[in-house]
């Protein structure tokens, strides 16, 4: 082995150990659950996820696909994969928490996440300042290797109105994803149109940084305000029911072509953009607490008339539902997709 190859191998081993220690400090309970199913130890688990071909100078970032407070997502190489990189070393444990959630979900799905309408996860790579200039010299952070999608549901509704057939496809996909999360005992905690990715005509849930396994200690509340269920406004924790509520708001945005409560807020403030003032936030919290998002978002009779069946279907997302509700909704949305295929 050449001196350069030996040096790279040593760096890789050091990064594997570093990431394993981060996982043990941040998520010991969830890590133990994942390791029990994988029948391995922390370092062997990280090594099993390692994507050497996209780590430590073996890959290049081509363009930014999206950026948030925790991470930026870059297109990789030929565009088949995307890399989610923490914005700083301090944010790295948050992404490793997401790695564990993805691992848990992949175990539940037998590795076939796409079939359950969750963005496929392909492992972990190491990123240094040489690849990502926002990092400090000598820092190495974990990055998630994900399947690259075409766009977000937010971009879809901003670009053009969707057909009824396509709306029912998105509804079916989101209900299928919600059902899978419930079966896997995972609460997403931050479902919104920006976190629903689209490839072709299909939708997939992404961004599990706020997610939690049901019987684990609750994560800090980071749900986007516009997508909060009324119970979260009063200090409650995210649940499967609040995930369903947020998914309903995503589907409502496809009908109105506005993010939740945005159109009414613009009319109220005579502004074309949200003000983010304290007064605006208080107004938004009051509107959410009413528990009637259809009333506060569908502001024209024409929309009510054109989307009557879909709005009737959506009302169920905003009230307490029976345990078997998702199965029934999935069957109904599948039937509607079939109807619109002809």
Swiss-Prot record:
Its EC number is 2.7.11.1. GO terms for molecular function: ATP binding; protein serine kinase activity; protein serine/threonine kinase activity. This is Serine/threonine-protein kinase ISR1. Residues 59-342 form the Protein kinase domain. The keyword ATP-binding applies. It catalyses: L-seryl-[protein] + ATP = O-phospho-L-seryl-[protein] + ADP + H(+); L-threonyl-[protein] + ATP = O-phospho-L-threonyl-[protein] + ADP + H(+). Pfam families: Pkinase. InterPro entries: Kinase-like_dom_sf (IPR011009), Prot_kinase_dom (IPR000719), Ser/Thr_kinase_AS (IPR008271), Ser_Thr_kinase (IPR053235). It comes from the Eukaryota. Keywords: ATP-binding, Kinase, Nucleotide-binding, Serine/threonine-protein kinase, Transferase. Disulfide bonds: none annotated. ATP binds at residues 65-73, 84. It is an enzyme of class 2 (transferase). The active site is at residue 190. Signal peptide: none annotated. Belongs to the protein kinase superfamily. Ser/Thr protein kinase family. The lineage of its organism: Eukaryota, Fungi, Dikarya, Ascomycota, Saccharomycotina. Probable serine/threonine protein kinase which may function redundantly with MPK1-independent branch of the PCK1 pathway.
């Amino acid at each position: 082995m050449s001196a350069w190859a030996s040096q790279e191998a040593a760096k890789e081993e050091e990064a594997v150990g570093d990431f394993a220690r981060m996982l043990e400090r941040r998520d010991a309970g969830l890590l133990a659950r994942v390791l029990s199913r994988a029948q391995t130890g922390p370092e062997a688990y990280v090594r099993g996820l390692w994507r050497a071909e996209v780590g430590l100078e073996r890959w290049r970032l081509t363009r930014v696909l999206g950026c948030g407070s925790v991470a930026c997502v870059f297109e990789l190489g030929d565009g088949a994969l995307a890399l989610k990189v923490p914005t700083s070393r301090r944010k790295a444990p948050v992404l490793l928490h997401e790695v564990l959630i993805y691992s848990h979900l992949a175990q539940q799905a037998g590795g076939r996440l796409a079939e359950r309408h969750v963005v496929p996860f392909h492992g972990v790579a190491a990123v240094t300042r040489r690849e990502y200039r926002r990092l400090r010299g000598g820092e190495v952070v974990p990055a998630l290797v994900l399947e690259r999608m075409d766009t977000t549901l937010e971009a879809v509704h901003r670009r053009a109105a969707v057909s009824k057939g396509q709306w029912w496809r998105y509804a079916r996909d989101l209900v299928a994803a919600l059902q899978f999360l419930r079966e896997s005992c995972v609460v997403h905690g931050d479902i919104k149109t920006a976190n629903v990715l689209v490839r072709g005509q299909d939708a997939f849930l992404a961004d599990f940084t706020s997610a939690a396994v049901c019987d684990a200690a609750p994560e800090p509340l980071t749900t986007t305000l516009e997508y909060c269920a009324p119970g979260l406004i009063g200090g409650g924790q995210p649940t499967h029911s609040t995930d369903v509520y947020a998914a309903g708001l995503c589907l409502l945005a496809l009908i109105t072509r506005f993010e939740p409560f945005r159109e009414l807020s613009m009319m109220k403030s005579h502004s074309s953009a949200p003000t983010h003032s304290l007064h605006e936030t208080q107004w938004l919290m009051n509107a959410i607490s009413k528990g009637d998002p259809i009333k506060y978002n569908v502001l024209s009779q024409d929309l009510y008339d054109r989307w009557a069946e879909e709005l009737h279907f959506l009302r169920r997302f905003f009230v307490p539902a029976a345990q078997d509700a998702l199965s029934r909704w999935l069957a109904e949305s599948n039937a509607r997709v079939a109807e619109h295929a002809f």
